[in-house]
UniProtKB/Swiss-Prot annotation:
GO biological process, one term: glycolytic process
Stretches of the chain forming a coiled coil according to its record: none
Catalytic activity: (2R)-2-phosphoglycerate = (2R)-3-phosphoglycerate
Pathway: Carbohydrate degradation; glycolysis; pyruvate from D-glyceraldehyde 3-phosphate: step 3/5
Similarity-based family: Belongs to the phosphoglycerate mutase family. BPG-dependent PGAM subfamily.
Domain of life: Bacteria
Task performed by this protein: Catalyzes the interconversion of 2-phosphoglycerate and 3-phosphoglycerate.
Binding site for substrate: 10-17, 23-24, 62, 89-92, 100, 116-117, 185-186
Gene this chain is encoded by: gpmA
Listed name of the protein: 2,3-bisphosphoglycerate-dependent phosphoglycerate mutase
Record's keyword terms, sorted: Gluconeogenesis, Glycolysis, Isomerase
Known partners and oligomeric status: Homodimer.
Length: 237
């Protein structure tokens, strides 16, 4: 018997997604296409009869605005929303803002793929005086220095999400609340890794499209019964 459903969604296409640039913690907004994707996601959820009790998102506007558009389509703009830096995208360090094709030409396909897809390899860190460091951003002012990365591996991203997932999100799901999480490609990959206990190889192969709801159905022990993309024709990922 299904106890509950969880909805995960990666933000709609951002301006830097469109320009093929590393984004990470840089606060870039949705592109025109991204806004369309977010509204379409809201319409799909409405057609499927979804309503929610609580929403989570990151502190980055591309995810926040995606959630806005979805909740507006659902006529649930009033819904309680918690924003957390722990749901941010992976921090890509000194790669942030750089074009992926140009970086590939400079460093080679193998090196760039290691930075992007491996579990434990960290991209080049921001330097100590780089103004892109989170310590210069007011939204992170209450965090300790050891919580603020200069760059992150995928494993580091997963590790920062684990306490938030276990301490904040999972208890709501256990309590029967209907939850939606609007986040980022790598933070959603981290959550899916926790839900499905993915192997390293499975995680590396997992890609999350922009603006498409992922539905998880659970039993009474919060074990996954099934998961699928919500689209005109539903399919497993």
């Amino acid at each position: 018997m299904t106890l509950n459903k969880l909805v995960l969604i990666r933000h709609g296409e951002s301006k830097w997604n469109n320009e093929n640039r590393f984004t990470g913690w840089t606060d870039i907004d949705l592109s025109d296409q991204g806004r369309i994707e977010a509204k379409n996601a809201g319409q799909l959820l409405k057609q499927a009869g979804f309503i929610f009790d609580f929403a989570y998102t990151s502190v980055l506007k591309r995810a926040i605005h995606t959630l806005w558009y979805i909740l507006d389509e659902l006529d649930q703009a009033w819904l309680p929303v918690e924003k957390s830096w722990r749901l941010n995208e992976r921090h890509y360090g000194a790669l942030q803002g750089l074009n992926k094709k140009k970086i590939t030409v400079e460093y080679g396909e193998e090196q760039v793929q290691q930075w992007r897809r491996s579990l434990n390899i960290t991209p080049p860190e921001l330097s100590d005086n780089d103004k892109r460091l989170p310590i210069y951003d007011i939204r992170y002012a209450k965090l300790s220095l050891d919580q603020l990365p200069k760059a992150e591996s995928l494993a580091m991203t997963i590790n920062r999400i684990i306490p938030y997932w276990k301490g904040e999100i999972l208890p709501r799901i256990n309590n029967g609340e209907r939850v939606i999480i609007a986040a980022h490609g790598n933070s959603i990959r981290a959550i899916i890794t926790l839900l499905d206990q993915l192997s390293e190889n499975e995680l590396i192969q997992l890609n999350i499209p922009t603006g498409v709801p992922i539905i998880y159905e659970f039993n009474s022990q919060i074990k996954t019964i099934k998961h699928y993309y919500l689209s005109i024709v539903n399919k497993d990922y």
